[in-house]
């Protein structure tokens, strides 16, 4: 078996064109253009690349984007003060604090301070809680984007045994809720999980997000499984790989996402979808 590649770049391009049309329509009707505020703390090269991509896509589809960069030793109060100003800015629909953030900054306090209706990353307790209650509001970008990929590929998820490898607040936990909403029987594995291979072997749908290059080999995967690789890891030779060994997994899976070019582009475009949703649903005036 040779897996069908789920091309995240192609799907993201379709969504991008759709967003562009919606913005053109808003302009024709003299409606306000959505605004996204991006906050970067420190000089993490990967984070700087991600921020540039997000701002670039904003420009492509006609969004307004504002960008703030702070040194790594910034006082938490300075970030909270900026967020308060952005919360009260009627031209800003979405606020994004790029992860990771330095240890002296309280993750929970920062994301709790963003107004839920401007939390386009979907990390505010209100938004994560709403997802758990089967009443999703603004949803975490990567998990929501993965569901979008499955829908575009016309994969029917109801009744599938889904295994989420990784239990982070950013991907694993919200993804498990998305999988439940999608009708899957869902298992979440983490660092304390015993016999991980057993769980993976039984997965019809496998989502992997642990940050370990080529960790999961094709031998572990069920024949005909759907494999979604969220990992993005840079090797010593400069090459980028996922958490799944793509070559061996492709021989067993029915569908698989590549790295790069899979989940990454969808995550970025989903951020803009969330920003437009926030504008239309919560901030029209």
Curated annotation (Swiss-Prot):
Pfam families xref list: THF_DHG_CYH (PF00763), THF_DHG_CYH_C (PF02882)
Functional description taken from the UniProt entry: Catalyzes the oxidation of 5,10-methylenetetrahydrofolate to 5,10-methenyltetrahydrofolate and then the hydrolysis of 5,10-methenyltetrahydrofolate to 10-formyltetrahydrofolate.
UniProt-listed GO biological process terms: L-histidine biosynthetic process; methionine biosynthetic process; purine nucleotide biosynthetic process; tetrahydrofolate interconversion
Entry's EC annotation: 1.5.1.5, 3.5.4.9
GO terms for cellular component: cytosol
Assembly notes: Homodimer.
Family to which the UniProt record says this protein belongs: Belongs to the tetrahydrofolate dehydrogenase/cyclohydrolase family.
Catalytic reactions on record: (6R)-5,10-methylene-5,6,7,8-tetrahydrofolate + NADP(+) = (6R)-5,10-methenyltetrahydrofolate + NADPH; (6R)-5,10-methenyltetrahydrofolate + H2O = (6R)-10-formyltetrahydrofolate + H(+)
Signal peptide: none
Protein name per UniProt: Bifunctional protein FolD
Keyword vocabulary terms for this entry: Amino-acid biosynthesis, Histidine biosynthesis, Hydrolase, Methionine biosynthesis, Multifunctional enzyme, NADP, One-carbon metabolism, Oxidoreductase, Purine biosynthesis
Record keyword Amino-acid biosynthesis present: yes
GO MF annotation, one: methenyltetrahydrofolate cyclohydrolase activity
Biological or metabolic pathway of the protein: One-carbon metabolism; tetrahydrofolate interconversion
Binding site for NADP(+): 166-168, 232
Keyword Hydrolase part of the UniProt annotation: yes
Gene: folD
InterPro entries for this protein: Aminoacid_DH-like_N_sf (IPR046346), NAD(P)-bd_dom_sf (IPR036291), THF_DH/CycHdrlase (IPR000672), THF_DH/CycHdrlase_cat_dom (IPR020630), THF_DH/CycHdrlase_CS (IPR020867), THF_DH/CycHdrlase_NAD-bd_dom (IPR020631)
């Amino acid at each position: 078996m040779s897996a069908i590649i789920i091309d995240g770049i192609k799907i993201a391009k379709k969504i991008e064109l759709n967003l562009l049309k919606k913005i053109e329509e808003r302009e024709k009707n003299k409606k306000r253009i959505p605004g996204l505020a991006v906050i970067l703390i420190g000089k993490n090269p990967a984070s700087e690349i991600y921020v540039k991509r997000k701002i670039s896509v904003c420009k492509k589809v006609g969004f307004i984007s504002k960008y703030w960069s702070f040194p790594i030793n910034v006082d938490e109060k300075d970030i909270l003060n900026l967020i308060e100003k952005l919360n009260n800015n009627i031209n800003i629909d979405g606020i994004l604090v790029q992860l990771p953030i330095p240890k002296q900054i309280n993750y929970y306090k920062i994301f709790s301070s963003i107004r839920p209706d401007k939390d386009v990353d979907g990390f505010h307790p209100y938004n994560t809680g709403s997802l758990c209650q089967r009443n999703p509001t603004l949803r975490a970008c990567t998990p929501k984007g993965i569901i979008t990929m499955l829908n575009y590929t016309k994969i029917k998820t109801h009744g599938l045994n889904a295994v989420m490898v990784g239990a982070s607040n950013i991907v694993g936990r919200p993804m498990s809720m998305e999988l439940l909403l999608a009708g899957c029987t869902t298992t979440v594995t983490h660092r304390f999980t015993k016999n991980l291979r057993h769980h993976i072997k039984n997965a019809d749908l496998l989502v992997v997000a642990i940050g370990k290059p080529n960790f999961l080999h094709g031998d572990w995967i069920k024949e005909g499984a759907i494999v979604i690789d969220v990992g993005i890891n840079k090797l010593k030779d400069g090459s980028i790989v996922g958490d799944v060994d793509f070559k061996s997994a492709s021989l067993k899976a029915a569908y698989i996402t590549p790295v790069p070019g899979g989940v990454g582009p969808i995550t970025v475009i989903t951020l803009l979808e969330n920003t437009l949703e926030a504008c239309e649903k919560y901030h029209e005036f």
